[in-house]
Regions:
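Conserved catalytic or regulatory cores that recognize and/or transform ribose-phosphate-containing ligands
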Residues: 1-146
């Protein structure tokens, strides 16, 4: 049973690389949003044309980025990091939940209260990327961590 996992959320740490490396050899395909801030912010106007109003500039980018998110969201891991308010991550978690997708949240304990409703929608809340890898391994072949 292959897994297609969308790795959404903060872009300031190497959590994605840790999960991909830990899952090497597993039947998992990973995808993610575009993590280049400039490309993600400007993709809409670069492709569809300039906008005078920043609201519409951002809106075009959000729509184009949403295509990638919707196509990639089979099973989702959403990471909430220590820095910045990650509204996009919260939206991606809600989208995955709304689409009935399996959702794993990766967050530090200090976010527990703020994310209690998001966590309630998740099938698992992990603290470390290695725990996500362990969940994926268990789902694929029933193997528990040693």
């Amino acid at each position: 049973m292959p897994l297609n996992v969308f790795l959404s959320g903060e872009i300031h740490t190497d959590w994605r690389d840790q999960i991909v490396a830990g899952a090497k050899g597993m039947d998992v395909t990973f995808s993610a949003p575009v993590t280049n801030h400039a490309a993600s912010d400007d993709c809409g106007v670069a492709i569809l044309g300039a906008e005078d109003d920043k609201f519409w500039h951002d809106r075009k980018g959000a729509f184009v980025n949403a295509i990638r998110t919707r196509k990639g969201s089979e099973d989702a891991v959403v990471r909430f990091g220590d820095k910045y308010k990650q509204w996009n991550a919260a939206f991606d978690a809600g989208l995955a939940y709304g689409l009935g997708k399996s959702l794993i949240i990766l967050q530090p304990p200090e976010h527990d209260h703020a994310l209690k409703d998001v966590d309630a929608a998740a099938l698992a809340v992990a603290r470390e990327p290695g725990q996500v890898v362990d969940i994926l391994r268990y789902v694929l072949d029933g193997t528990l961590p040693s």
